[in-house]
Regions:
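HEAT-repeat alpha-solenoid elements in large eukaryotic scaffold proteins
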Residues: 91-94
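Conserved hydrophobic register position within alpha-solenoid helical repeats
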Residues: 96-102, 129-134
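Bacterial N-terminal signal peptides that target proteins for export
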Residues: 4-26
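Bacterial signal peptide processing site
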Residues: 39-41
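Boundary at the C-terminal end of the N-terminal hydrophobic targeting segment
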Residues: 43-48
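C-terminal motif of bacterial Sec signal peptides marking the signal peptidase cleavage site
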Residues: 35-37
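Mid-to-C-terminal functional-domain signal that highlights helix-capping/loop sites
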Residues: 53-59, 73, 77-89, 112-478
Length: 478
């Protein structure tokens, strides 16, 4: 929840309409003036001490290098000039080599965040310049692919951002996708911009996604109100292929994993309720949120093309409010003003044959999604077999990063995770699987969670994802 005001839905929409009539967005020149207003003090005059992030391990269970020193004062004049020149130079399709090197020699570790952001816009010749500046500023070299290595380190080091970082990042990221501006322009958002990166695709801002409408620039396209068939009509889908099963008010539906890997977002109606079902393929996390109980307003969710620590960054297309994919909590825009947190229901990950046998009246998304599209059996083709492809920072070493867990919140709101493989084996052996008052029961090859016989929302995810968004999680062990 948020301490910002809580207007009615009418107030939400009125604010949205006012925002749409705002004038041109502040540009790079304004950034330079804002940074200059901070003064030209030497950032090293009040610097945090270097320290070793003791106990923090990367995804290969190796320790991170010593945390670099970070300035606590205003940025120095030469650094301000360098920062102010970078976006305009990139806009001219030139790479600002001298400015990047000046940042690398600044001695202020806070600017490592900016260098990492800049890496996504660097030319082939510019990448080594950014890498060298990052190594100079951090005092630590690295070998191999720089994108995840740099990202993992700055996430683990958890350095503060430099002054006016949101605006600095805005100037870079709007060169990629100008339609992200409303996210950056909400000064009171709950977004930690340090954790936000580009996922390599553009925003899905299509007002309708029911007939295969395309994104001209390329996006991860949501699917609205997909066509469905009965279970017999789902004979096209192999029995051993996975579905994400949802039951609402006694009505069951299966969402084939291969279709969800293409769309990553389905807005649907099931059991008389409106649902949004995001699937973050990077986190292996399919979740189901009710979107019809927001004070009479129904958000329509889309994929932004951004990521937040390797998790999908979704948003409501009507109000352009960002919503935390893992928690359902609005983190920007009018929905944050209204204190909106979407309620969840359980998603069961199950083989289609087992789901169909347990839920004989189930429906399943049509083979063509209702939009005449052909879906390959395995769209990702083993993409994640070698580990996370985006930075995840420090990891909880209790499990491997890609071990699958079922995550829930207990009655006190404490996160609890159950390793799926071990939990299934225990249940098959007739053992009880419970922790913190939460008990698991099998469902068609998947799992459901209960407290005192009352079902609670649950979903599966990779361990790295669940543990980083729920760092205080309790872990069940067999």
């Amino acid at each position: 929840m948020t301490s910002r005001g809580r207007p009615s839905v009418g107030g939400i929409l009125a604010k949205m309409r006012r925002d749409l009539h705002h004038g041109p967005l502040v540009g790079v020149l304004a950034t330079a003036m804002l940074l200059g207003a901070c003064g030209g003090a030497d950032p090293l005059s009040a610097q945090s001490q270097s320290q070793n992030p003791a106990g923090l391990l990367d995804k290969d269970r190796q320790p991170f290098p010593t945390t670099p020193a970070a300035g606590t004062g205003a940025l120095a004049g030469p650094v301000l000039e360098a920062l102010a020149s970078i976006a305009p130079t990139l806009r001219q399709q030139r790479f600002p080599t001298d400015a990047v090197r000046a940042i690398g020699q600044s001695g202020d570790g806070r600017l490592l965040w900016y260098l990492y952001d800049l890496l996504r816009l660097a030319t082939r010749d510019g990448v080594p310049v950014v890498v060298e500046a990052f190594e100079d500023l951090s005092g630590a070299e690295f070998a191999g692919e720089p994108f995840t290595a740099m990202g993992d380190r700055i996430l683990a080091w958890d350095l503060p951002a430099p002054p006016n970082y949101r605006q600095l990042k805005r100037d870079l990221f709007l060169l990629i996708e100008p339609r992200w501006a409303p996210f950056f322009d909400d000064e009171d958002s709950a977004i930690d911009w340090r954790l936000v990166g580009w996922g390599g695709v553009f925003i899905d801002n299509r007002p309708a996604a029911t007939a295969g409408e395309v994104c001209p620039r390329g996006c991860i396209p949501a699917l609205d109100e997909p066509a469905v068939t009965d279970a017999a009509g789902g004979s096209w889908y192999p029995d051993d292929a996975l579905v994400f099963g949802v039951v609402v008010n006694g009505e069951a539906r299966a969402y084939p994993k291969n279709i969800m890997e293409v769309h990553e977002m389905v807005n649907d109606t099931l059991g008389g309720r409106r649902l949004a079902i995001p699937y973050c393929t990077l986190c292996l996390s399919a979740q189901a949120y009710f979107t019809d109980d927001v004070d009479g307003f129904a958000p329509l969710l889309r994929t932004s093309g951004l990521l937040a620590r390797s998790n999908k960054f979704m948003y409501d297309i009507t109000t352009f409010s960002a919503v935390d994919t893992f928690t359902g909590e609005a983190i920007s825009g009018p929905l944050l003003d209204a204190g909106v947190t979407l309620n969840q229901t359980t998603v069961v990950t199950s083989p289609w044959g087992a789901w169909r046998a347990a839920h004989q009246d189930t429906t399943i998304i049509a083979e063509d999604g209702g939009i005449g599209r052909s879906y390959p059996p395995d769209p990702l083709r083993g993409r994640d077999e070698a580990g996370p492809i985006f930075p995840v920072g420090d990891v909880d070493p209790r499990l491997g990063v890609h071990e699958v867990v079922l995550g829930v919140l207990d009655a006190d709101g404490t996160p609890v995770a159950f390793p799926v493989g071990s939990a299934r084996l225990a249940l098959e052996a007739g053992e009880a699987v419970d922790l913190g008052g939460v008990t698991l029961q099998p469902d068609s090859g998947g799992l459901r969670a209960f407290i005192d016989s009352e079902e609670i929302p649950a979903h599966e995810a990779f361990w790295f994802a669940w543990s980083q968004f729920q760092p205080q999680t309790r872990l069940w062990e067999r």
